[in-house]
């Protein structure tokens, strides 16, 4: 891990301010490099204190550079001095970052003590060389039935949570952070990219209450911040995660909520820099920007970074360039369905659309693979029969198909589960379900052993034993 140090020797001045973008002129032969951090500090004539960091994006010629602001540019005027720090934006890394909230510049924003970090690292780095990578597929248990069975996470892999607005992406991420901290004692880094300030505040307070805060570093670049901050906050969080992987040799979880906002911020910056837009108005450098971020999220021989990324799908259109570009980098895709959310089945993970590259018999084992396939086949057959049921009714089906429908409806409900982080809303205590219990539960439903239990007994329970217990209670009523 390289520790960057800034040397302030180079001073220019602002020649133009266009919203969150400035042009600055420097002495001949002393142009700052691309990605260098520039600082503007001082007091305006009206007495407003200004302290803004910029990142160089373009060299314009005539000794001028164009840079993007990481915070509000209120109060900036032409002629103000600009200092080239001589290094990219550098952020604190290591143990002192845990339990704290940072902004894109690595400054604590939780009103706590200053961070006593010994080491700092630049946010721009190359991806690890190919020889350092490890390629050993290994499943990662999350305690969430639908994910562990049908879209298992790969240790050190990348997972995408796809869904439109309000289907439960952030709640699912919060549950994963809780389960990883409680069951695996793992470290997590959370990047809040362009999401609501309220959600960031809620997440912080929930983690404090559940006692997992000391295992997480939080980095926020919210909706109200300039596009430069939202575009770079993912790299700040990734730099902190890389330190735990490379120096502390730990397995880390990196949560990004929301990767679409990273693309959106890049699109805004691209327009401000005067680049010609590409498909659907996105930046022409979309694939490169995404690749630079995603290729650094990987497993090396020292440790692993497993990444879970919420992907907002504009207008529920999976062919939009932003989600489509993200797809190419993922090992598992967890698709959240609005129709399941409308039925009240949470987590609203679509069992047929969600998939994982490690759901193979030689990686997860024959028993897991066969159970997952049988579950998907049953649900697929139920989906095919729904049109017939809608037109002719359930009575017109063959006895075999009636059985398939009954089991599919039980499976659909058993895929739901009460969450720890949603206890306040649901009133049901959260459940962590071991993979072996998940497989056993679905095998018992598929075998027909539990055909006599009411469907409602399978809704929002953990293990199959809880479903049987719930059925007894329903019967006694």
From Swiss-Prot:
Record has Membrane as a keyword: yes
UniProt binding sites for ATP: 163-170
A Pfam short name: ATP-synt_ab
Topological type in the membrane: Peripheral membrane protein
Localization: Cellular thylakoid membrane
Gene3D superfamilies: 2.40.10.170, Bovine Mitochondrial F1-atpase, Atp Synthase Beta Chain, Chain D, domain 3, P-loop containing nucleotide triphosphate hydrolases
Keyword terms: ATP synthesis, ATP-binding, CF(1), Hydrogen ion transport, Ion transport, Membrane, Nucleotide-binding, Thylakoid, Translocase, Transport
Top-level enzyme category: translocase
EC number: 7.1.2.2
Translocase recorded as keyword: yes
Location, primary (coarse class): membrane
Catalytic activity: ATP + H2O + 4 H(+)(in) = ADP + phosphate + 5 H(+)(out)
SMART domains referenced in this protein's UniProt entry, alphabetically: AAA (SM00382)
Function: Produces ATP from ADP in the presence of a proton gradient across the membrane. The catalytic sites are hosted primarily by the beta subunits.
Family the entry assigns: Belongs to the ATPase alpha/beta chains family.
Family matches, as HAMAP family: ATP_synth_beta_bact
Subunit details: F-type ATPases have 2 components, CF(1) - the catalytic core - and CF(0) - the membrane proton channel. CF(1) has five subunits: alpha(3), beta(3), gamma(1), delta(1), epsilon(1). CF(0) has four main subunits: a(1), b(1), b'(1) and c(9-12).
Protein's UniProt name: ATP synthase subunit beta
Protein's organism: Synechococcus sp. (strain JA-2-3B'a(2-13))
